[in-house]
């Protein structure tokens, strides 16, 4: 009886360990200055705050942040193969396009690059989320609309997950922005952390 009970406990432990191993989510974040913590100490940036939250909540989620200030979709395409090989992510979150838009890159080129980033990640076995980026109004209503629509088009074509933009409510509040009116300040970082915590949970459960 005792031997059977011990065997049962041992199987439960192995099952639990196996479940924990499967439940580990490794998210490769490919982004620009908005995720790189532009103008801030790294410990103040939303990605660092969110990773701390996952640790505090005992969530087996790791964020690998490859965000670089000024990064465009074509820059990321030059590096994504190496990132995927080095980090072997289960998930890839793409927060890119803002710099493409500010520089007036053609919308079709943006869509092509985003599609390539998504499909490369999917071919590597990762689940992909594409954040719907919005650009400043001074770039003109027609270009802005075509730009924003690119994200839903790419997700429909590729089956990627469309994630809402974390700057939508922040960009219109000057108290949450740096003096350049392009980047979120330190006060905005916990707000972005909480927003992304909710949105990433939705994505992982999708």
PLM features: what roles do these ranges have?
Residues 1-9:
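Bacterial N-terminal signal peptides that target proteins for export
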Residues 9, 24-27, 59, 68, ...:
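Catalytic-site microenvironment of enzymes
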Residues 10-14:
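Hydrophobic helical h-region of N-terminal Sec-dependent signal peptides
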Residues 18-20:
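N-terminal signal peptide c-region/cleavage motif recognized by signal peptidases
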Residues 22-69, 79-88:
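Serine-esterase "nucleophile elbow" of acetyl-processing enzymes
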Residues 35-36, 70, 135, 172:
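Active-site micro-motifs of SAM-dependent methyltransferase domains
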Residues 41, 68-71, 105, 184:
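Short, surface-exposed alpha-helical recognition segments that flank or form part
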Residues 75-206:
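Alpha-helical cap/lid subdomain in secreted, periplasmic
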């Amino acid at each position: 009886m005792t031997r059977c009970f011990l065997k049962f406990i041992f199987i439960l432990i192995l099952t639990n360990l196996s479940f924990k191993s499967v439940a580990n989510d490794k998210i490769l974040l490919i982004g620009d200055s908005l995720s790189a913590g532009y103008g801030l100490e790294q410990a103040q940036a939303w990605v660092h705050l969110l990773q701390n939250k996952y640790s505090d909540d005992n969530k087996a989620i790791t964020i690998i942040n490859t965000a670089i200030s000024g990064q465009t979709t074509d820059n990321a395409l030059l590096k994504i193969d190496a990132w995927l090989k080095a980090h072997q992510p289960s998930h890839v979150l793409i927060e890119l396009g803002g710099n493409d838009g500010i520089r007036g890159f053609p919308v079709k080129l943006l869509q092509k690059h985003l599609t390539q980033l998504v499909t490369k990640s999917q071919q590597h076995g990762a689940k992909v989320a594409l954040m719907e980026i919005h650009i400043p109004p001074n770039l003109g209503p027609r270009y802005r609309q075509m730009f924003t629509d690119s994200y839903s088009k790419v997700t429909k074509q590729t089956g990627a997950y469309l994630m809402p933009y974390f700057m939508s409510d922040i960009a219109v509040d000057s108290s949450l922005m740096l003096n350049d009116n392009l980047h979120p300040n330190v006060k905005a970082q916990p707000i972005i952390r909480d927003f992304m915590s909710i949105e990433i949970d939705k994505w992982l459960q999708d």
